[in-house]
Amino acid sequence: MKRNNKNLSFILDVDGVLTNGQFIYSERGKVQKIFGAHDSDGLDLIKNHLKILFISSDKRGFKISSKRVKDMGFKLYYVTNQQRFKFVEKYNFQNVIFMGDGVYDVEIIKNSKYGITPR
C-alpha cells in the first residue's frame, strides 16, 4: 500500500474473525478463546496507512479479547450487537472496510465501502 489514507478505517469484529469462534468453558464460565498465531502479520503491513480498530459484543470474554488486541498494538471497543451499525456509521460507511461474520454484521457489510467475511 503506497499512500497513507488515515480517513479509511478497517473495523474488525473479534469473535469468528480473529478467533475460530469457539470458547473454552469451565465451571466458572468462559475462560479461553482460540486466536491464530499470525493474526497481526497482515495488519502490521497496513497499520500505518489506515485506522484499524476492533469491536466485540462479548461482554464475558471481553478481557480475553482486549488482551489479545492490545498485544497486537490495537484498541478494542465493546459494542453490543444492537449498537454495532451506529458505531460503524460514525466512521462514514464510504470510508469503512469492515470484516465480520455474524448476522448483525450483514447490514454493515452491505453498507461499507468494502465488506469482508472470513471463510
Give short role names for the model-derived ranges:
Residues 1-82:
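Alpha-helical substrate-recognition element adjacent to the catalytic core
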Residues 10, 76-77, 96-98, 115-117:
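Short, well-ordered beta-strand core segments
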Residues 44, 89, 106-110:
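Alpha-helical segments flanking ligand/cofactor-binding loops in enzyme cores
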Residues 61, 84, 108-111:
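Generic hydrophobic secondary-structure packing signal
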Residues 98-119:
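Acidic, Mg2+-coordinating phosphoryl-transfer loop and its flanking beta/alpha structural elements
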